[in-house]
Amino acid sequence: MSRFFTTGSDSESESSLSGEELVTKPVGGNYGKQPLLLSEDEEDTKRVVRSAKDKRFEELTNLIRTIRNAMKIRDVTKCLEEFELLGKAYGKAKSIVDKEGVPRFYIRILADLEDYLNELWEDKEGKKKMNKNNAKALSTLRQKIRKYNRDFESHITSYKQNPEQSADEDAEKNEEDSEGSSDEDEDEDGVSAATFLKKKSEAPSGESRKFLKKMDDEDEDSEDSEDDEDWDTGSTSSDSDSEEEEGKQTALASRFLKKAPTTDEDKKAAEKKREDKAKKKHDRKSKRLDEEEEDNEGGEWERVRGGVPLVKEKPKMFAKGTEITHAVVIKKLNEILQARGKKGTDRAAQIELLQLLVQIAAENNLGEGVIVKIKFNIIASLYDYNPNLATYMKPEMWGKCLDCINELMDILFANPNIFVGENILEESENLHNADQPLRVRGCILTLVERMDEEFTKIMQNTDPHSQEYVEHLKDEAQVCAIIERVQRYLEEKGTTEEVCRIYLLRILHTYYKFDYKAHQRQLTPPEGSSKSEQDQAENEGEDSAVLMERLCKYIYAKDRTDRIRTCAILCHIYHHALHSRWYQARDLMLMSHLQDNIQHADPPVQILYNRTMVQLGICAFRQGLTMDAHNALLDIQSSGRAKELLGQGLLLRSLQERNQEQEKVERRRQVPFHLHINLELLECVYLVSAMLLEIPYMAAHESDARRRMISKQFHHQLRVGERQPLLGPPESMREHVVAASKAMKMGDWKTCHSFIINEKMNGKVWDLFPEADKVRTMLVRKIQEESLRTYLFTYSSVYDSISMETLSDMFELDLPTVHSIISKMIINEELMASLDQPTQTVVMHRTEPTAQQNLALQLAEKLGSLVENNERVFDHKQGTYGGYFRDQKDGYRKNEGYMRRGGYRQQQSQTAY
């Protein structure tokens, strides 16, 4: 045992009194006078053996323990301080590490600390709750640990690949070699410093091995005595007595030579002590587990062991022998509902009680009125299961909700005498009197609207690229079926306002779906289809276009709220545009005047408006109306926030612009993935439309320095393409459009066509359209026509006349089309030329300046501006400011400056006379 403990202990005084004849334990100054008669020379020898290594690694272990304690209490400032000390201590032990290798407990703390800091850094809510010092220390320590760990990257990687094996190896060595470290250290670090220090001395030979074994036993004795010191002071005296007896038996020379006789009895005693120590450790662990179990009694947590699952008994709703009547069931229902929303209420148990109450009511034939009332409360409890608005329903709860609503609708359809409404008071409810119509307070429409919201939240919070999303999307068929059933119910018994609301729900689940069957029926004439196909079409019901027309017209006529009517109009326009009914969609948009006041609508309606405008622009593009397509898409694409404006994601902004609450609200407004519009397709349509408009315009106004830009985004893409020093083959969609634009500038329509329509662009964009071949044919036609216009604008100064047949062959257009294009250009005064009908040629008038003349005009303009600037500089040097005296040179020369020519002096001279 150490001198620091033996000096002030009672056991030492007792041993010195009992054994006065043996001078074996001098203290204080006697230590230096009698070095050969010490009773603690075993410990002195031990310190000599471990002095070069153990001190350094014990220091590292203590610092690591402090860091781990700081990590547990989230004290990052303390972690930073101790990490700096740890680095200094490791630098002191560098010579030992070079010989022995990096200790694994050191690698482990580096890896764990880095992972811990990364978790804190990613926890945004936790970072906001940190105080200023901890937040600053977190940033500093994170940078330091990342920089520091670069030197140990290979060690950390190997540790992370197999941390369990590393811990097991260290634990084995710890059990075999180090008996001097505490159990808490083993739990904290997994590897002790003593284990690492004894790696290379595992196989000493001869008597030195015996002596080392003896030293291990003595170390174990000393630790056991330290562990027991707090409980029994007598153990210390007995240990010291045994050490004195050993000191008598062993010669001093053998002490200095670090050799000691080792017998089989000593080995057995050491093994027994190891077993006792392991038993103590196991007892402490089991005691800790028992204490945890006692603490958890009466709480929610329960320790479960493998085996047969526990079957809980059903709760008893009523006492034995109670007569089940309507009043008793309603009273029990009110008791259950009183706990709803209170803190500590088990919501799952509440739902289970309500379901059990339904079974009891059905078994006792209490009537459908009671069952309907309980069903309403079950569905409401399912919606309240998650109190947080951001969280979505679990799959099992969602399934229960759908089943319960279907069961409720079955009861309502089977019992027409049951009336359900929000305006029915609880006092006026009739739940059991069959002579009168049954009246139940509740709103089936509100439940269905909440069901639709929950479905949207489920789709928003599911990974769209997973199979789980597909499984959830299959539930939409059930949702639509429930909405359709409620629609039929409300058409019979609901008010006009309720019918408008349920119609809007039906519209919102229909407007974005492309009706392929109706599209095929339009392509296939009735004469060409078989009788079975016609019968099948009749059985399928009305087309989506007819359904949308019927529902929307009812809302237009009956609705009294602007919001429902606005949403219905936008959905109707979207559906028309999706099915290529451009003129109906355009007329409905213009007649509604929504673009005038849409900025006053709420954000979800604005998102729907943006989606409708985008779909309208894509529809115009499919019809070949590039100008209309460009105008419809201009506002969305020019903002650079198409993703956010369409409700398909959030852009990265600074925290100052959007706090956490605003971000949550905006995420709840996002459109589910299956409603998304392809942003790459949208951008491609916009850029191609801009190309077909901008390139001919640029060619027509090439010499005009003040020409306006039709599309800033298109010009930006052109500038980006021109900045590249090396131009390779285009890869992205934007690069394809830029390359096609450069080819169109030269009038090379074939190269332009090859860049716009190829396998890569087909896969990314054009194959996504319902009528892809029709769109590609339209694009080829547009490229040929605009390339012809660009060619005439660019090279009109080169030709005196050109044959229309030549132009027809060059651009593979028929002669009437070429004639029509040139005639429009001449009528609009875009091309100064005339048509010679007998020869079918275009005669150029050469009224516009040539390229050389344009350059001369530009030079003259610049020289004129240069002369004006020089005159201003000269006047400034002469002392005339603002150009005043430049215009009044005669008055200046005649000494009639502005001080001499005022009306004030004239008035003075007149008054003098």
UniProtKB/Swiss-Prot annotation:
Residues 1-44, 157-301, 522-542, 885-913 are annotated as: Disordered. Residues 166-190, 217-232 have a biased composition (Acidic residues). The modification Phosphothreonine is found at T524. It is found in: Cytoplasm. The keyword Protein biosynthesis applies. The keyword Lipid biosynthesis does not apply. Residues 673-849 form the PCI domain. The modification Phosphoserine is found at S9, S11, S13, S15, S16, S18, S39, S166, S178, S181, S182, S909. Keywords: Acetylation, Cytoplasm, Initiation factor, Phosphoprotein, Protein biosynthesis. Component of the eukaryotic translation initiation factor 3 (eIF-3) complex, which is required for several steps in the initiation of protein synthesis. The eIF-3 complex associates with the 40S ribosome and facilitates the recruitment of eIF-1, eIF-1A, eIF-2:GTP:methionyl-tRNAi and eIF-5 to form the 43S pre-initiation complex (43S PIC). The eIF-3 complex stimulates mRNA recruitment to the 43S PIC and scanning of the mRNA for AUG recognition. Belongs to the eIF-3 subunit C family. Component of the eukaryotic translation initiation factor 3 (eIF-3) complex, which is composed of 13 subunits: EIF3A, EIF3B, EIF3C, EIF3D, EIF3E, EIF3F, EIF3G, EIF3H, EIF3I, EIF3J, EIF3K, EIF3L and EIF3M. The eIF-3 complex appears to include 3 stable modules: module A is composed of EIF3A, EIF3B, EIF3G and EIF3I; module B is composed of EIF3F, EIF3H, and EIF3M; and module C is composed of EIF3C, EIF3D, EIF3E, EIF3K and EIF3L. EIF3C of module C binds EIF3B of module A and EIF3H of module B, thereby linking the three modules. EIF3J is a labile subunit that binds to the eIF-3 complex via EIF3B. This is Eukaryotic translation initiation factor 3 subunit C. The lineage of its organism: Eukaryota, Metazoa, Chordata, Craniata, Vertebrata.
